[in-house]
Amino acid sequence: MARTKQTARKSTGGKAPRKQLATKAARKSAPATGGVKKPHRYRPGTVALREIRRYQKSTELLIRKLPFQRLVREIAQDFKTDLRFQSSAIGALQEASEAYLVSLFEDTNLAAIHAKRVTIQPKDIHLARRLRGERT
């Protein structure tokens, strides 16, 4: 017979179980009157990891089109009033903006991991931008 690795187990001890008080035993044997089932909850981090996998697979735009369009028009108004945009121009701006943000967050995550953390912080974004040469 082959040897198998022994694992530590909790010992049961040699003592016999003590008698429970009558009220405790009655409470345990009586069925729960409420019968309200708790909603299922995933462990912390499980849903986050699922979302990460989902969004890494997908290619669709994550910022809604109309709010992004309003933002572009608001920023453009500071430079020249009554500017008009082709819908393809707004789409190109949105593609470029989202690609930039995803790339920045990837670098930010690497900076947080380098600092032995899993949570990104503003200082990680500053470091990532500084290393890219965007901001001094």
From Swiss-Prot:
The modification N6-acetyllysine is found at residues 10, 15, 19, 24, 28, 37, 57, 65. GO terms for molecular function: DNA binding; protein heterodimerization activity; structural constituent of chromatin. Pfam families: Histone (PF00125). Coiled coil: none annotated. Keywords: Acetylation, Chromosome, DNA-binding, Methylation, Nucleosome core, Nucleus, Phosphoprotein. The modification N6,N6,N6-trimethyllysine is found at residues 5, 28, 37, 80. It comes from the Eukaryota. Phosphorylated to form H3S10ph. H3S10ph promotes subsequent H3K14ac formation and is required for transcriptional activation through TBP recruitment to the promoters. PANTHER family: HISTONE H3. Belongs to the histone H3 family. The nucleosome is a histone octamer containing two molecules each of H2A, H2B, H3 and H4 assembled in one H3-H4 heterotetramer and two H2A-H2B heterodimers. The octamer wraps approximately 147 bp of DNA. This is Histone H3. The lineage of its organism: Eukaryota, Fungi, Fungi incertae sedis, Mucoromycota, Mortierellomycotina.
